[in-house]
Amino acid sequence: MQTLTHGGDWMGYREQFGRDALDFSANVSPLGLPKGVADAITAALPQADRYPDPLCRTLRAALSEAEGLPAEQILCGNGAADLIFRLALAVKPRRALVTAPTFAEYATALETVGCTVERFTLNEANDFAVTEEFLDAIVPGVEIVFLCQPNNPTGQLASPAFVRRAAERCAACGAVLAVDECFLDFLPDGDRWTAKPLLHEDQNLIIFKAFTKLYGMAGVRLGYCLSADAALLEKMRNAGQPWAVSSLAQAAGVAALKETAYVARVRALIAAQKPKLTTGLRALGLRVIEGRANYLLLQGPETLGGQLRQKGVVLRGCANYPGLDASWYRTAVRTGPENERLLKTLQEVLG
């Protein structure tokens, strides 16, 4: 059987148990696909007999307005993961630096091009927050550095000043700084934390973003990246297949950018439910790393995940994250009733 790295394997659960689970393993919007996006996909169906625009011109124009950046600084892909792999193929670095734990696809993409991946282990005693020592690890010879903002699975967020210093260290070493902001838009004050202001002064910076999480579009597959390095974006474009983003995904993205009321509802829900879920988990004796994201990292018995699966609830086991072990789990923050079911099921399991 093929081993899957990530959460969200609803089909695997259905095959095993013959039913669907309440899935907390995928960090997507608990409100589902916005109606306006679903309508846009339906409206785009008559164009399915045509090849999609390989340059995503309409979508990039909409993103240009939304992000306040020239369309020439935007590249779209089949999810952020697609673009992460394209970056590895474009740069072909020999040596890279990532944190541990962090999103697995950075190392996976880098290793496909023979890159040596150095992992900076984050301190559990410090709730896995990234520290100044990480900057000291950015040395000549390191050709690319990945920083996840907020980090997955810890939810920890480095300050804009820290990201600036990381960018400066990378520039001094001739390294690319790749900042993953795929979960940043869940924060009401995400604009305060983004690395976008650095794009105006740093050719070595690239930022990854995605529609997947905030808009509940995981199955549509749509992401994009931002960079002032036109040559790098062109290399990345050439490293991927020409029609990576379907017509339906492009239409969905344009529609999603108009869903400001939906985004406000998602942010309000997470802001209201996350403290309640955190309190409930801690009341059950579980250690919780709260972070700033729409998910929580928690620690409990190594048998916890399997026991919950038997009862129809799925967490993201974190044993395959370097820097964590089988006692760590990640849970999304979902709706009030869903979070209550999680807490009730945990209480049954933990006694």
What are the language-model segments listed below?
Residues E111, A129-G141, P153-L177, E181-L214:
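Active-site pre-lysine segment of PLP-dependent enzymes
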Residues A161, Q310-K311, N320-G351:
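PLP-dependent enzyme catalytic core of the Aspartate aminotransferase-like
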Residues G32-P34, L55, N204-I289:
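PLP-dependent aminotransferase class I/II
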Residues R119-T121, I144-N151, L177-E181, I289-E290:
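Short beta-strands and strand-loop turn motifs
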Residues I270-A271, L281-G312:
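Conserved PLP-binding catalytic core of the aspartate aminotransferase-like
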Residues M1-R50, G141:
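N-terminal "arm"/small-domain region of PLP-dependent enzymes with the aminotransferase-like
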Residues P52, S64-R86:
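Short loop-beta-helix segment that forms the pyridoxal 5′-phosphate
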